[in-house]
UniProtKB/Swiss-Prot annotation:
Annotated source species: Bradyrhizobium sp. (strain BTAi1 / ATCC BAA-1182)
Protein name stated in the entry: ATP synthase subunit b 1
InterPro entries: AH/BAR_dom_sf (IPR027267), ATP_synth_b/b'su_bac/chlpt (IPR002146), ATP_synthase_B_chain (IPR050059)
Lineage of the species this protein comes from: Bacteria, Pseudomonadati, Pseudomonadota, Alphaproteobacteria, Hyphomicrobiales
Topology with respect to the bilayer: Single-pass membrane protein
Top-rank taxon, per record: Bacteria
Amino acid sequence: MHLLADPETWVAIAFVILMGLFAYLGVHRTVLKALDHRAERIRNELEEAKRLKQEAAKVLADYKARRASAEREAEEIVTSAKAEAERIAADAKAKMEDFVARRTKAAESKIALAEAQALADVRSAAADAAVQAAATVLSQSVKGSLGEDLVAKGIAEVGRKLN
């Protein structure tokens, strides 16, 4: 009887009775169902996480492809803008050189025209002075109608030859 006085024996007996009662009531099936349900939920969550990871990888790959495409497109835009700017600069330079050449040619022709006009004016003034001098000399040395006729003929001839 010494065994019945030991408290550990009564704890063991209570445990065995409790386990028997749990087995009779089917608690183990409920616990197994709960564990199975939890395992299924965890499996579903893992599958969902795997699916989301794959979807995120696809989105990331799509983003990287779009980014690379945008970078290439931006590079093409910059390249074409540089080429266009160089073309515009070359056109502007050519137009400016043409404008300067035309202005230089116009200025040179105006200068040549002014030189020709000045030369003609100098010749005309020299001719007029020569005619006046000749008229004065001849009128003083030759007197009468013969002198006047000679002076008139000489003036007319000099005027024809100089102009």
